[in-house]
Amino acid sequence: RVAVLLPDEVGRNRFYYPPLWQGVRDYLKNSEDLNVECTEFSFPNEIDPFHSRGVEEVRALLAEDKLDGLLTVGHMEAMTMQEWQHARDAGVAVVQVGFRNPKIAPLCSVQPDYEVIGRTMAELIFSHIPSFGSVVLCAGNPKWEQHARIVQGFEDYMQENGAQNRIYLDNSCCIGSEAQRNILKLLEKPDVAACCSVLSQGSVMLVQGLQQCGKAGKVFAVGSDVFEENLDALRSRILDNIVQKNPYAQGYLGIKALVEYLVQGKAPEQRTIYVGSEVVFRSNAVMYDRDNFRGLLL
């Protein structure tokens, strides 16, 4: 028996997690002949999932030794170390998507190369703005290593290429009125020539801020993750590019690795399986419409 425990697909989670869930479901649909019972569990609050119903149900199953495998995200403390230790002692196979948490000792993780994403964002921006232009960077939560690694890649690219542009950092990680005001205040600075975000919710606030301050289409802007609002902003020339982290492939390959291990005894060849990230332009945005991404991103 396998459990999938991920953030749900509504509210603030709707910008990133639906393709991840879809990847899981597509693989399982194509593997119905395998002897796998998979149950979905979700939680609404990505910041503090510990007390959500979905997490509590999975914790109970683990405590009662009723699970053989678990697919979950790697960047959150959904369970205590004692509970993870019990799962390891019971032989539960854990695959993480999005980030590898070595404290949990997962079978493997499936994730993008976040530092490469940061370098890609930096290269896009610094090939389009003058050396004196400043950049607003929505850097997300510095305690989440996937956000921090994108920022690190961005800064490494700057250092290696001699870019001395000023960077205005915003560490908001959720859409909110205060976060929106902070981002707007940064965008209104007269020296800002570009902006980008390491996370989907930051992209939403960047787009709103650019529209509010009258700089939409005048500041080079790079968004994060493919969802309808970002695609609309790309088509409307508010965003110039989108860098997507391929959550569909993360979900598909994550559940595939878990099922193959449990059913066939096939261990993953690598502890960390990297999925490719891609740059979306207006010219290729159509490839991400209407589920075209399913074949494109595997």
Question: What kind of feature is each model-predicted range?
Answer:
Residues 142, 158-161, 246-298:
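Hinge/cleft segment of the Venus flytrap/periplasmic-binding protein
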Residues 25-39:
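Signal peptide-proximal N-terminal region
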Residues 69, 91-95, 108, 134, ...:
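Proline-centered loop/turn at the N-terminus of a beta-strand
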